[in-house]
């Protein structure tokens, strides 16, 4: 089912603050709390809302470095791709991994306590022949100017 104006407003509000009360949501979309809760549950059931998470203050956790790694695989065989992607999924330091177009196959965002840990991590990946990594190009984050807080939503059709 295509989201209507009220659904899009709910999605926008919940992307900004997943702890917004049903009462506050209801007031914002001018529906009863029961009707609003039903809409939220429907959006969850339809997969438009996939979960709720806390936004953690990275600086409060202590010093960390964030690295963006462009990774090229030696080949595109399904077994190689599956092993590589499973490794990225298992690595706690990998906070995001995107398959991309261009000269590299993946863009990986990695968060480590220091460069030594990043080096240890990537050396381990390169030494694991089964992962099929040909090349890693590293870009260190100097400053986060805008962090991801939610997807842009389409305009309502009515």
Enumerate the predicted regions with their spans.
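A compositional/biophysical signature of low hydrophobicity enriched in polar/charged and small residues
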Residues: 1-158
């Amino acid at each position: 089912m295509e989201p209507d104006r009220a659904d899009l407003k709910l999605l926008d509000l919940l992307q900004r603050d997943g702890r917004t009360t049903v009462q506050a949501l209801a007031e914002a979309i001018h529906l009863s709390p029961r009707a609003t809760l039903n809409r939220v549950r429907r959006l969850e059931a339809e997969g438009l809302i996939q979960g709720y998470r806390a936004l953690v203050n990275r600086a409060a956790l202590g010093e960390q470095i964030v690295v963006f790694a462009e990774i090229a695989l030696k080949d595109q065989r399904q077994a190689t791709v599956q092993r590589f992607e499973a490794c990225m999924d298992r690595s706690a330091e990998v906070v995001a991994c995107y398959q991309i177009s261009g000269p590299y196959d993946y863009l990986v965002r990695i968060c480590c306590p220091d460069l030594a840990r990043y080096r240890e991590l990537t050396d381990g990946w390169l030494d694991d022949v089964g992962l099929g990594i040909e090349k890693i190009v590293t870009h260190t984050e100097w400053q986060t100017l805008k962090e991801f807080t939610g997807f842009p939503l389409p305009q309502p059709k009515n």
